């Protein structure tokens, strides 16, 4: 029998215990032996729990038990999770995690440490929750060079944008509903609505795609706080939907760029029809072409099932998994990984008449003008062009309240 430990007994950690028990027979068949949770590390008091005997407040309990071969990390964050995971890997124990912040920040280091100590460091649940993305990418697509990734990887903001579109609802009201349903944090929803969650996820995918560590701090990131009902309606006029897109590009010259930002997505694009809490990631391989991964990006049991799948792989394959699941450390570059490509560009402007926008912003057309506010779609521009347009509008006494690229097919 394989004995494992869980560090952190929140939503996902408790889900891991539930999955291990409910699907014990199928897990044993796939792992080649029964899998049992022997310890749960959590500093809170669970003395009234039916599983009270499993709980410990000390990681040394886990590290001093030679029966523990795999440790599940679902603490979250990096303050405690990172040093605990390091100690587990240094002891030769494999670690399976759903912690996107830790993987995005320390992934290269922890992968190398695992390899050094003949262990596995697995993190399927860190990007797609219960939707498989990491394993297909480093195994099934291993013969492909991935040059482009576009994705909706945050279910909370996608739910909010869907609500805003379907029910003519503002940002604040959509956020309140997302919080009531448990999709967004009540105290600080910033990780979701400001794009930080999506940034960490695209950093992980970009690192896998290019083979070296991509730092989240180098990825330009914007959320959806500035999106209004007027923008939603303008998108519909333009046969598009507004989505928070996490993206990665590698150009022919080897230069890479990445970002997280709201975009106008043409209805002809597969991502435009991804609604509610669903996620989708579109990748372009040089041999396969386009491939799409689609499913719910979060949730207790979907995410826990992905973690347990990693546990099975760690028990069966161990260090062999790292033959393809690996990226190298890299020095942190200065500045941001800016996109230099040309796109149609949506501008919502205040304080400047719509009639002046063609001469200021270049060729394009007015989408709407109402109550001192106007929206204009520039036919083609780079981010540098838009920065220059923004300066011109400010000189005229106006302001660019929102700018978005338009993503075509």
Regions found by a protein language model. Give the residues of each.
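N-terminal glycine-/serine-/threonine-rich beta1-alpha1-beta2 phosphate-ribose binding loop
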Residues: 1-91
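Conserved active-site and cofactor/substrate-binding residues in soluble primary-metabolism enzymes
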Residues: 7, 11, 15, 35, ...
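General beta-strand structural signal in soluble alpha/beta enzymes
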Residues: 55-56, 73, 96-98, 121-125, ...
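Rossmann-like NAD(P)H-binding beta-loop-alpha module
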Residues: 68, 115-197
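Rossmann-fold NAD(P)-binding glycine/threonine-rich loop
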Residues: 81-87, 91, 98-138
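Catalytic, metal-anchored helix/loop core of enzyme active sites in primary metabolism
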Residues: 148-150, 158-161, 165, 183-190, ...
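Substrate-binding/catalytic subdomain of NAD(P)-dependent oxidoreductase enzymes
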Residues: 173-273, 278-280
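A conserved regulatory-domain signal marking ACT and ACT-like small-molecule sensing domains
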Residues: 311-409
């Amino acid at each position: 029998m394989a004995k494992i430990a869980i560090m952190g007994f929140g939503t996902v950690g408790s889900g891991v215990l539930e999955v291990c028990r409910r699907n014990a027979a199928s897990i044993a068949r796939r792992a080649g032996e029964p899998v049992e949770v022997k310890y749960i590390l959590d500093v809170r008091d669970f003395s009234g729990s039916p599983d009270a005997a499993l709980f410990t407040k000390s990681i040394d309990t886990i590290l001093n038990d030679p029966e523990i071969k795999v440790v599940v990390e679902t603490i979250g964050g990096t303050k405690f999770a990172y040093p605990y995971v390091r100690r587990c890997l240094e002891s030769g124990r494999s670690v399976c995690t759903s912690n996107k912040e830790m993987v995005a920040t320390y992934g290269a280091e922890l992968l190398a440490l695992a390899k050094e100590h003949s262990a596995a460091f697995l993190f399927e649940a860190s990007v797609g929750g219960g939707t498989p993305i990491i394993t297909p990418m480093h195994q099934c697509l291993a013969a492909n060079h991935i040059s482009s990734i576009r994705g909706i990887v945050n279910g909370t903001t996608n739910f909010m944008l869907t609500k805003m579109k379907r029910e003519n609802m503002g940002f604040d009201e959509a956020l309140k509903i997302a919080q009531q349903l448990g999709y967004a944090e009540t105290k600080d929803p910033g990780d979701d609505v400001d794009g930080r969650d999506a940034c960490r996820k695209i950093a992980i995918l970009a690192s896998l795609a290019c083979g070296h560590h991509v730092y989240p701090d180098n990825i330009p990131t914007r959320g959806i706080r500035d999106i209004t009902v007027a923008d939603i309606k303008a998108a519909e006029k333009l046969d598009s939907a507004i989505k928070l897109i996490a993206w990665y590009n590698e150009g022919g010259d080897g230069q890479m760029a990445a970002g997280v930002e709201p975009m106008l997505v043409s209805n002809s694009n597969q991502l435009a029809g991804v609604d509610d809490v669903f996620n989708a990631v579109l990748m372009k391989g040089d041999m396969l072409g386009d491939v799409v991964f689609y499913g719910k990006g979060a949730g207790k049991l979907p995410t826990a099932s992905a973690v347990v799948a990693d546990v099975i792989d760690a028990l069966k394959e161990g260090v062999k998994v790292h033959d393809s699941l690996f990226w190298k450390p890299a020095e942190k570059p200065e500045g941001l990984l800016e996109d230099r490509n040309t796109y149609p560009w949506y501008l919502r402007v205040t304080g400047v008449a719509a009639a002046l926008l063609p001469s200021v912003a270049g060729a394009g057309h007015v989408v709407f003008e109402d109550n001192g506010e106007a929206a204009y779609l520039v036919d083609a521009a780079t981010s540098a062009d838009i920065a220059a347009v923004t300066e011109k509008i400010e000189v005229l006494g106006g302001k660019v309240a929102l700018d978005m690229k338009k993503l075509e097919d």
